[in-house]
């Protein structure tokens, strides 16, 4: 495994396919912005979206940051999505809803329940993409993948180890890929995302009907 400290850019030696080329029979196709574009399709309409923010921060101020960010996500979706704290989500909702999870496995219990089943592993200030490991408090990730509770539905992850970084995730230029790992340096100084700001890594997953996997580096 390659350990990469935050702020080190990965240049992947593999050639990533465009959207849809490696999907097989997978119903979900990504990328991140695809969730915002096609969630109103028939199979999405019958399974509404629930936005779940973590409540496990030590500081109540950080929990409020998560809740405020959940409202931002709802506004982007332009949908009557339900917003709930992680302690208030039922198993029925986890199985029947598309999930948007905000926080980390340490601060969001729903996130923690599915963390080992996600194609990218998020630990304590670490993010592992295939055989690449990023470390640092000032890093984060946006990712779309099948919902481990119901693989016909999606889970959209907004995660950062510093609440101040999470608060500004929408200033990171993202959407055209299935995932993006970023650092504080990826945040735009203005109100709009800056495509010239570097990410640590972004890419697509190898998509099979029941499993999505990131491309390993050689």
Give, region by region, the residue ranges found by the protein language model.
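Solvent-exposed alpha-helical segments and adjacent loops
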Residues: 1-218
């Amino acid at each position: 495994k390659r350990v990469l400290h935050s702020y080190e850019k990965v240049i992947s030696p593999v050639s990533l396919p465009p959207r849809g080329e490696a999907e097989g029979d997978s119903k979900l196709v990504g990328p991140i912005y695809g969730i915002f574009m096609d969630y109103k399709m028939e199979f999405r309409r019958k399974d509404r979206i629930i936005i779940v923010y973590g409540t496990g921060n030590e500081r109540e101020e950080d929990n409020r940051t998560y809740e405020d960010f959940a409202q931002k996500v709802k506004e982007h979706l332009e949908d009557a999505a339900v917003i709930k704290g992680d302690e208030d989500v039922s198993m029925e909702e986890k199985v029947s809803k598309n999930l948007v999870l905000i926080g980390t496995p340490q601060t969001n219990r729903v996130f923690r329940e599915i963390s080992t089943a996600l194609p990218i592993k998020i630990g304590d200030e670490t993010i592992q993409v295939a055989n690449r490991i990023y470390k640092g408090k000032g890093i984060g990730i946006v990712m779309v993948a099948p919902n481990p509770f119901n693989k016909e539905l999606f889970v959209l992850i907004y995660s950062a180890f510093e609440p101040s970084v999470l608060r500004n995730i929408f200033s990171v230029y993202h959407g055209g890929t299935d995932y993006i790992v970023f650092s504080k340096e990826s945040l735009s100084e203005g109100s709009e995302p800056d495509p010239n700001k570097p990410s640590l890594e972004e890419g697509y997953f190898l998509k099979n009907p029941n499993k999505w996997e990131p491309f390993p580096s050689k």
